[in-house]
């Protein structure tokens, strides 16, 4: 047996016995083109920063657009596409800073390397989210993907991001923008609103909570003094300063603890947000969250766009565009996501 063949056999045995972690990123992505500010973009300099701990002024700048997203191996392909879409449609892409949140159990260095290789010029930070504190509060929902502790990271942004970050746009990983995110970030929150998002008052709001909730005379009074409407938590503008002052993370956790004692809802991280904020948010034009393109939570069937203009397409629901494209069964609207997909195909890797 030749030495070369022996080495190949040994290598094969090593690969067979090496477990592949669920957090391992095996996909490779192309490098995105670099995008530059237009001439009228505001300058960000050292005077913009009021936090000596932060290395670059942009991470604390009020002139920057701060975007928060979660990162994990399962959705990294969607995250990369979302970032590309944000940058491509921005008038001031160099004034955008990304705040990524990854689970403590994830390979944060691998996630960081993936973003860096596709966007070497991007200003971003990866924050590690210790899920142990929230895991004890999570109750099972109608779809296992909704039970992932990282889905609850949006409730902890005020704790994870530096205190100097006062406002952030939170985005899910299964969406793309086709408009300038600065317009969304500039949403007027008024004198006291903590959160802004498109709300949908035609949706059957009662369906988001169980009969146990509505039949309880105390719990059912939760929305008595507000016009509560459904809103999707995948796209939100959040005033983190007001969030911190109002201790809203604790308020959400209180409802999650209640859910552990009596089942008052079925849909993961969404209902606690509705319980705390529904009827109190600043409404945003529906164009900023054309959601539901992933179908329902059970079958993920194809759906059409809602009537009206579109600034953001969101594949919330079970069906994800990258999975349907790979399976050769894409929905018509998945073709709008495909141009932002930076995944390197096996052919491209070999060439």
Swiss-Prot record:
More about this protein: The name gaolaozhuangren came from a group of small people in a modern Chinese novel.
Organism whose genome encodes this protein: Arabidopsis thaliana
Glycosylated residues in this chain: 130, 204
Family: Belongs to the glycosyltransferase 8 family.
Transmembrane segments: 6-26
Pathway involvement of the protein, from the record: Glycan metabolism; pectin biosynthesis
Enzyme class name: transferase
GO cellular component, one term: endoplasmic reticulum membrane
PANTHER family the UniProt entry points to: GALACTURONOSYLTRANSFERASE-LIKE 1-RELATED, GLYCOSYLTRANSFERASE 8 DOMAIN-CONTAINING PROTEIN
Tissue: Expressed in stems, leaves, flowers, siliques and roots. Detected in fibers and xylem cells undergoing secondary wall thickening.
Membrane topology type: Single-pass type II membrane protein
Induction: By light.
InterPro entries (alphabetical): Glyco_trans_8, Glycosyltrans_8_dom-fam, Nucleotide-diphossugar_trans
Annotated protein name in UniProt: Probable galacturonosyltransferase-like 1
Compartments (UniProt record): Endoplasmic reticulum membrane
Molecular function via GO: polygalacturonate 4-alpha-galacturonosyltransferase activity
Coiled coil: none
Effects seen without this gene: Dwarf phenotype. Severe reduction in the mechanical strength of stems and collapsed vessels. Reduced fertility.
């Amino acid at each position: 047996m030749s030495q070369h063949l022996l080495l190949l056999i040994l290598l094969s045995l090593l690969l067979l016995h090496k477990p592949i972690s669920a957090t391992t990123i095996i996909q490779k992505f192309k490098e995105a083109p670099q995008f530059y500010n237009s001439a009228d973009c505001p300058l960000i300099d050292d005077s913009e920063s009021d936090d000596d701990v932060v290395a670059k002024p942009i991470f604390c700048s009020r002139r920057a657009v701060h975007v928060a997203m979660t990162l994990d191996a399962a959705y990294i392909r969607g995250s990369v596409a979302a970032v590309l879409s944000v940058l491509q449609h921005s008038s001031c892409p160099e004034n955008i800073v990304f705040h990524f949140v990854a689970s403590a159990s994830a390979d944060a260095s691998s996630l960081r390397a993936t973003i860096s290789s596709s966007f070497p010029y991007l200003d971003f930070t990866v924050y590690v989210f210790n899920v142990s504190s929230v895991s004890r509060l999570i109750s099972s929902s109608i779809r296992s993907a909704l039970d992932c502790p990282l889905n609850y990271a949006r409730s902890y942004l005020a704790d994870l991001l530096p205190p100097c970050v006062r406002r952030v746009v939170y985005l899910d990983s299964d969406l793309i923008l086709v408009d300038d995110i600065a317009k969304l970030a500039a949403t007027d929150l008024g004198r006291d609103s903590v959160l802004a998002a498109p709300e949908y008052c035609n949706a059957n709001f009662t369906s988001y909570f169980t009969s146990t909730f509505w039949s309880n005379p105390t719990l059912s009074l939760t929305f008595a003094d507000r016009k509560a409407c459904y809103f999707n938590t995948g796209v939100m503008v959040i005033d983190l300063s007001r969030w911190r002052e109002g201790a809203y993370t604790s308020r959400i956790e209180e409802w999650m603890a209640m859910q552990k004692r009596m089942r008052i809802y079925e849909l993961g991280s969404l209902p606690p947000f509705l319980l705390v904020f529904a009827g109190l948010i600043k409404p945003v034009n529906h164009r900023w969250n054309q959601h539901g393109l992933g179908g329902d939570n059970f079958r993920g069937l194809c759906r059409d766009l809602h009537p009206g203009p579109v600034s953001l397409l969101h594949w919330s629901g079970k069906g994800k565009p990258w999975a349907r494209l790979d399976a050769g069964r894409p929905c018509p609207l998945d073709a709008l996501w495909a141009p932002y997909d930076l995944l390197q195909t096996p052919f491209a890797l070999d060439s």
